[in-house]
């Protein structure tokens, strides 16, 4: 007699607790949720607002408040300073001294017509501070020197082996003239890989005779040159003039034209 045919028994099984039921788009009303199977292991508490690791700077939480709109970001003044003054500088720190370059804006005076004119050009203030320890500088003993626009131009024209010297008397034309002497020398280093900035100050009013020098590398001097080229129009007030030009307010040039101007406009 042949053996009996095997019997197959099919039993309905409960879906695993970690799986969600399949969603059928055509019949959303028939969607049911299978309650998870009770487990003896206690689930860890989930925080209401997850916090990303500090390493993930690109984490975005839709519940978090939106970031600021850029008032305090790169290229713009901080909050509340849109109409205020912004100070900036370029500083170089070496073993024996530190040197800071600080631009100063031109002085504008109002006219009766409501316009403005430049009464005094801006300048770049050089501040030398001697070192008192490793990476420590005494800014209370600093010596300063103001570079005018034409002095900046002289510095920009220096060749690899050229040097220049500027002399200042802060009291020139006054009764104390000659009592304070400041001499700034800029000369190449012996190896030709940089510059020396040397400031000598003699002040007989307070019995000071001091000389502070600092070596400047080629890279640092390149930054100085690039910055000076950029800042010159701003120190002269020309950038402010260009920003004030408005096509809708332009009027015909009414000053009598010279022969050369007439030839130029032909």
UniProtKB/Swiss-Prot annotation:
Keywords: Chloroplast, DNA damage, DNA repair, DNA-binding, Nucleus, Plastid, RNA-binding, Transit peptide
Location in or out of the cell: Plastid, Chloroplast stroma; Nucleus
Keyword Isomerase annotated: no
Sequence motif: Nuclear localization signal, positions: 172-185
Region (Required for ssDNA binding): 94-99
GO molecular function: DNA binding; RNA binding; single-stranded DNA binding
Family matches, as Pfam families: Whirly
Origin superkingdom: Eukaryota
Annotated protein name in UniProt: Single-stranded DNA-binding protein WHY1, chloroplastic
Protein species of origin: Zea mays
Gene: WHY1
């Amino acid at each position: 007699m042949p053996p009996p045919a095997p019997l197959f028994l099919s039993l309905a099984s409960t879906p695993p607790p970690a799986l969600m039921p399949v969603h059928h788009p055509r019949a959303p009303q028939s969607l049911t949720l299978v309650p998870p199977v009770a487990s003896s292991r206690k689930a860890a508490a989930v925080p209401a607002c997850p916090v990303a690791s500090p390493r993930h700077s690109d984490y975005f939480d839709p519940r978090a408040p939106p970031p600021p709109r850029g008032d305090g970001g790169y290229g713009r003044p901080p909050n509340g300073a849109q109409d205020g003054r912004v100070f900036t500088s370029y500083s170089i720190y070496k073993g024996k001294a530190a040197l800071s370059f600080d631009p100063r804006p031109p002085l504008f005076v109002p006219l009766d017509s409501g316009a403005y004119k430049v009464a005094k050009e801006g300048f770049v203030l050089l501040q030398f501070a001697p070192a008192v320890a490793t990476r420590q500088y005494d800014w209370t003993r600093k010596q300063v020197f103001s570079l005018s626009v034409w002095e900046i131009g002289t510095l920009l024209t220096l060749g690899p082996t050229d040097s220049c010297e500027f002399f200042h008397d802060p009291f020139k034309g006054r009764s104390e003239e000659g009592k304070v002497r400041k001499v700034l020398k800029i000369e190449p280093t012996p190896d030709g890989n940089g510059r020396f900035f040397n400031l000598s100050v003699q002040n007989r009013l307070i019995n000071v005779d001091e000389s502070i020098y600092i070596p400047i590398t080629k890279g640092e001097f390149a930054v100085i040159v690039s910055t000076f080229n950029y800042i010159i129009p701003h120190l002269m007030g020309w950038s402010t003039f260009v920003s004030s030009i408005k096509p809708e307010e332009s009027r015909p040039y009414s000053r009598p034209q010279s022969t050369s101007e007439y030839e130029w406009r032909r």
